[in-house]
Design a protein with these regions (language model features):
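Conserved ATP-binding/catalytic motifs of P-loop helicase motor domains
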Residues: 1-196
Length: 196
């Protein structure tokens, strides 16, 4: 739960303002990007009370959904659950390196004319990105991807997720709050992050 006395930084407030404008636009996809410690989680948790639409919180993994559930004090589910996807487990054709999925039913967890907020989006591969956007559009909803470009790439991929290149709008948080500016390691961490 977020303390009501917390003050957002200028960038964080700007991100919220842009997301709220995005919700009124014809665009479907917004990407909020930021390094660890820039306040992505805080920004999302402070955005939620300002939303005047239904929303669904999700993430690619159970662990990420649990973390999101804790910092937003709200239910979060996996992307696959939201999309009603189950793994294809035909034992005669099972290939651990090439797992497929099938839709078990029409997705029930995507809000109509609402917002899907997906954390840890750097892990989303091209096919899953396309499916998410297609499904969200079919419900006349919008998607907000939240990610850190220095986090995990999509599984079996050597390139960044489409969340960095195919969203209608993108905003990047740059100011790091979690580390003290006097921390002697911070410049080294920033150099490593920029090295890509």
């Amino acid at each position: 739960m977020i303390d009501e006395k917390i003050q957002l930084g200028q960038e964080q407030q700007q991100a919220i303002d842009l997301i709220l404008q995005f919700l009124k636009s014809k665009d479907t996809c917004f990407s909020l990007v930021g390094a660890a410690g820039t306040g992505k989680s805080l920004t999302i948790s402070m955005l939620l009370p300002q939303l005047d639409c239904n929303y669904q919180l999700c993430a690619p993994t159970h662990k990420a959904a649990l973390v999101m559930r804790n910092y937003c004090d709200n239910d979060a589910i996996t992307l696959h659950s939201m999309l009603s996807l189950s793994p294809k487990l035909d034992i005669t054709e099972f290939d651990v390196l090439n797992l497929g999925f099938y839709m078990t039913k029409k997705p029930q967890q995507i809000p109509t004319k609402g917002l899907v907020i997906c954390d840890e989006a750097s892990m989303i591969n091209d096919d899953l990105f396309d499916l998410i956007v297609e499904r969200v559009k079919s419900y006349n909803s919008k998607i907000l991807f939240v990610s850190d470009k220095a986090q995990l790439l999509p599984v079996q991929s050597t390139k960044y997720s489409k969340v960095y290149t195919h969203c209608d709008q993108t905003f990047t948080l740059t100011k790091i709050y979690r580390q003290s500016s006097e921390n002697c390691i911070l410049p080294i961490l920033n150099d490593l992050r920029k090295a890509e």
